[in-house]
């Protein structure tokens, strides 16, 4: 397999992303988007005109791209033209599409339990990894990048190093989860990475963890259309249903904006069920009125 040639322009884009502390996943997404634009143009992307951008956006729309994918590419091109090319004015010719607001899928507590118990073996590796995803609300990449030293059993905390947005944070470590992690450590004696891959100098990959989740979900007989990230959604929703302050959940999830966390208020069905409708107060007044009329 021949290595892909890195042009001076691509190298500059990569350097600009590194300077701004962009994560590896975001870097790859930006490069893919810029490559797609270059393929559409048939020439170097830095030579594009406003008309080229208009034609590309029409092409993406006609190709049936989802608003989410469309916007991901626009974000990448805005970065490319403003930061790498120094052509800030080009941002005026790129429009975001409105994304339909979909409520996240959420598991019941029983479904989470069934999935974790069905995690593939041998051993406790994937059960422990998936349990952290739910028990601490971590993203797949955050679970994979955990080190043994990130588990603080004295203060019952997990240190999440450079999560999304390149920010560190602390999350809770429950006694039950600590017990499972200790059982995993006694079984495998991992060094360095909490969940080593092959070779052991590398951690397991998000793709491996996602495959383990899919297998566990299938074995547990859970039919909901869900991904590994659904465990994180469920963590947040179950906390909210237990009356945890939404601002605390925001910190635990590592959300920069409270509005991002607030969407879980729309799926906290237990909270909805337990909330008394003002109609109940009206009904009581009506009952009292009826009783007085009968006296």
Language-model features, listed with the residues they occupy:
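Conserved catalytic core of the tyrosine transesterase superfamily
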Residues: 1-295
